[in-house]
Amino acid sequence: MEYLEDNKTETFEEEDKEREEDQVLDSDEVLDSNELNDMQECLSQTDLSNIDNNRAIQQLSLGSMEFPSYTTNSEKEEMLLGLADNFWHQYTHLYPDRKPLFMCPRNECGVEKFVCTTLHPTLLPYSDLYDWDQSAKFVSEYLTMEPLNPPLELPRSLFSSTSVLQKQSGNCFDFSVLLCSLLLGAGYDAYCVSGYATREMCLMDEKRNICPLLNKVEESSWEIPQKPLKKYTVKPPRQLISKFAVQQEAKKQAKMEEALRNEQEEETRLKEDAEKPGPDNLHGLRVHCWVLVLSGKREVPENFFIDALTGKSYATISEPFLGVESVWNHEDYWVNMQDCRNGCKDMKFDLGDPVCWEYLLQGGSKPLLLIPDEEDEEELNGETIQENKTIFQMPPSWVLPIVIRPKEFETRCPQGRKILQYKKAKHEKWAPYLKRDGHVSRLTGYLDTECTQEVKIQDCFQNRKDKLDLREQNKIEQVTTEYFIPGRADSLKVHEYRSLAPETERSMMFYSEARLDGLQRRDEKPVEMTEIYQGRADFLYYRHIVFGKRPKKVAIAGGPTEANPRPILKITERFNRNKEKPANEDVAERTFLLTEDRIQLRCHRKDDHITTSYWEFLKPANLGEKDTPIVLTPETCISYQVEPSEKFSKQLYVYETLVTLQQAEQNSKDNVRKSETEVREILATRAQEEADPQLTISIYDTERNEKSKEKREAMERAIQEERQRRAVQELDYLAPFLAQLGDPEKLTLWQAQKVKEDCLSDMKQRLIEKANLIQARFEKETQELQKKQQWYHQNQMSMSKEDEEAYLDYCSEAMFRIHILETRLNRHKDLAPQKYLALEDRLNKDPRLREPFLTS
Amino acid sequence: MSSLYDTMEPNVIDDDMLRNAVEEQGPKEEAGRIAKLEGIDFKHVSSLRLDFKNILKIDNLWQFHSLTKLQLDNNIIEKISGLDTLVHLVWLDLSFNNIEVIEGLKALTKLEDLSLYNNRISVVENMDTLSNLQVLSLGNNNLTSLENLIYLRKFKQLRTLSLAGNPLSEDDQYKLFIAAHLPNLAYLDFRLLNENIREMATMKYQYSIDDITHNENQEKRKQEEEEQKQRELDLHKAAYVENLNGPFLFESMYADDADGTKLSGLPGVAELMDSYRSKCIEICQNIFEYGMKQHEKREAEAFEFNECMQEAIRENQEQGAKKIQELTEKNSEILNELSQSGNQDFLDLKISQYIDDINKLLDSLMTLELQLVDQTEEIIKEYERNVSDMVSAFLETVQGLMAQVRDLENHHHEKLLEISINLLEKVLKGEMDDEITDDIRMIFVDKDTVINAVSASHDIHLLKIDNREDELVTKMNTWANNLIQKVQKDEIQRNRNRILEITTYIDHLRDELDNLELHEQM
């Protein structure tokens, strides 16, 4: 008990007095029985966990363990261990109250290794890992965390990063060593830190943290730039308002706001209190290991911590870090001499300061504390250089280089999936291609801390053939939003909907530059549709359509919906200003009231006018019909013109405008119908894509691209076959004959003659044999046929019809066979001499049998 | 045509002919019926065809102001005239006529397509202003000289040219000559000039073309230089310090001064002149630089003023437009309601409400306008004050500098007088007999003559300086006055226009309502 008590209050005092004071203070605290129980439990676990650790070591029969550096210590390492031992003895002698240091844990082979040599600075060939944040993310994702057991003591062993990577799991020390190795390799001034942290930190419990992905970047407040006051800026008109009244109003407003704010603050405080974790009995005792990055290298502006378990960075004054025992990198080891009563808030990380940090080797490149006196500095430099020569250098790392294969790098999490729990949020990750629909991550937001009621789901996809990138589902409003990357045939960018049925509320955004009609956005409501365009040659940028109710119609059984389109009540189109036309003739808004046969036109405002011209046309009933005179009454066209002109008042103008407008109306109607069809088509495509999601595979992806894989394999196979074929071809036709002679290097004339003769006679023999064989078969067939015929002639009378047919079949078949054999025989007879001659020719030409090569 | 010419009386373009042509060629079918009923205004006709009419003289076309296409082919026109008012013409067809000289086309700067096929033209000329010409048809004419076609190099846009049927087109070199000399031409006699021909042509006429291009380039450069000079001078003139950045003033002093020039030949005067000259130039340069700076300042001031003015007007306009927009939206709602509702009381209520709205709109628009007038008045006054300050400061400084020039002149005069009198004594004593010319001897007769001559020169110089100063001061003051007047006038004009617009619009709204009421009652 005393020990625990001590530990609990333990801070790293150097003065006895101080410690005594603290003890006096702390002895006031009374531990209740509950806490006692907790601690006993913790202690009882200690033994068990030791066994666990040992077993783990035994189980790991890794290939790398056969490597000598893993199983033995080199001479230099032995010396280093001696030094460390010496240091440790002195340390415990000087500071008997401090906890043991983490210096020489055993590795996976049970060999003591100094911690600094466990760090192996490595730069992996992935550009992602060049920056600390991506490295930290990788480490936190790649490994599975095992909590320290017991949580209050340093682990007995520290495995090499290679075996940690192999089993894809480790404790905080393993995490930190791996991350530190990567960071050092990338050129950061990184250190492993052994110290104490809060329970949440040690257990990687992020249930109380807000998910980092949910923290949206706040939109930068868009300030309207203050217009510079120019010399001739007009004065604003005088406002006839009582200043006093304004003041009173402002005061009232301020009061109300303050009350509201107070209320809100109160609320949030209450909420926070409720969410606070219960008190931790072991606060300040939990051992943890993390990474420290010092400023200076790689443009790091100031020191910060990285928690390797979560991959998050913290300022060095962050609260969760409660104390530091020691830090190390691949070059040296430092012990903290500063007071950690206030956590790490007052810590200095100037490792060259011997008052704050006690070094082990002083072999590192860390400069000594900078002394402002310049003369001294020079001397000092000289000294250090001299000293450095004699100083013991840290032996190279015993760990094999860290290797991560591309596939492992891509798969990341063990088994390709990982689940992180945050406050009111859950984040699931999958490796690409793991899920059949290309799902790579899902972020679920919950309404309550217990995570029962879903509010929002964010699904990320990758490599989808339909270019789906992100799907957001708002469970409260039942709205789904899908985001697509460019490249779809319909150029869809965002699709927001409640249901996939047509003619319901939805909003679609498009990549307008990829579309011929420049459509940027289409919003739909049950009876309305709004389309927004961009960059069109006809300056159209807005179209609004109001639909009416479908007239009742006797439905054709199974007929398509197009058979009964919704009637269009009104089409409004707006246009951008066309600078080439005068404003009075450039239409800004065009409204077709289809049910009333009316068309309204409104022109753009001219630069120095405040009114706009407009026309209202009432379509005559027989417009567009040929050979019927049209009566243009004054009511046909009601207009207001900013600058009345004779041209516009002419009847001819009215008539011509009417005709073009009618054409335009028809076009607009067609376009609306097209839009409706398109929406229906997109919805159908989407439904199909969702039902059967397909993934694309890059042509450079040699692992997954089936086609290229097949092709490659086929190519390999072809090469193989080619090789075999060549081998067969090289089979020597003279080989058996030469073998008879005992494979002489060179043939004598006589031997050549013999070989030639043998070969030819063999050929002759074979040809004759073949001919005989065919002859024999032919004869056999003929005989059989004759027999059958005889039998037939004998029994012809008593035969049934079927037998007769069978006989006839047999006859025709036999005749066919005989005929074939006959042909073959003839052919053979024809070919045999040729073949014989060919062989003879070949033999004559064969270099081995020709004169110059023959030994006499 | 010539056979017809003998037998038929030439026709005159008169109103009936024009009307018939316009109606015949105007809108067709239903539109044509309406147009006929209504009558077509010659002003709005854009294309006219008057072929096979036996016209001798082009006349009476001044009404067709917006005409872009005119066909006068197959007539007996002998002289191109009466086309000066048709400045919008793009297409002109004068083929199959009896034209002998190209003329009267100066005003048709927009012309792109010109056909003079089958006429009696012998020289290509008088087309300098037709810089947009793209198609030119000169077939079946009397063109004889290939050299004359170099004239066509002027038309950078010319793509199609037809010359077949001319005496010159029988020349073997005809095609090559044209291909070489008109590099922008794409079609000759309706055939593509391909790369081959062009290459051959360039090889053949290498030297002459080089010569021509060289000359053209030189001319162009000269023209550019002149333009540059002119621009600079204009700028200086705008700053009212033209010809002050050099010895112009000094030289102009001696230009009309015979005695002075003579006197400057005296021994010892040369040095005096030199120092006087350099000092004078220095001061002039000062004036010039100061003037340019002031000019820039004035421009900046004007720019800033205009900008602020425009901004104020724009803001005001937008407010007004917004108000009108609001009313329009409301208006359409009310009209809808009116058309749907049958209740008389409700109608009356709505209508009175609408009338109120209109009145309110009128009020607010007028208030806005008044407010703007107040605001602009204020800044115009300020601008006026600033401009006059600037002008007076400028004039003061310039006058001070001019006074320096005058001092210099006085000083010079004294010195000259002294030297002259000294010299006179010597001359009278006969010491200088060999050194002086006869001209000077004429002056150095007696003291009075000498003094007269010197003072006369002095007077001339002073007069020149005074004149220059006066010119500058007057111009400057006129500018200031004009500027302010113009600004005020513009503002008044703007105000008038706006008020007119507002009243027209309000009247229109009221009319509309009246019509509606009338309609309802009926």
Swiss-Prot record, chain A:
It comes from the Eukaryota. Residues 1-30, 255-277 are annotated as: Disordered. Signal peptide: none annotated. Residues 1-11 have a biased composition (Basic and acidic residues). Residues 245-276, 661-733, 764-790 form a coiled coil. Residues 12-30 have a biased composition (Acidic residues). InterPro entries: CEPT76/DRC7_peptidase-like_dom, DRC7/lobo, DRC7_C, MORN_DRC7, Papain-like_cys_pep_sf. SUPFAM superfamilies: Cysteine proteinases. The keyword Repeat does not apply. Belongs to the DRC7 family. Component of the nexin-dynein regulatory complex (N-DRC) a key regulator of ciliary/flagellar motility which maintains the alignment and integrity of the distal axoneme and regulates microtubule sliding in motile axonemes. Involved in the regulation of flagellar motility. Essential for male fertility, sperm head morphogenesis and sperm flagellum formation. This is Dynein regulatory complex subunit 7. It comes from Xenopus tropicalis (Western clawed frog). The gene is drc7.
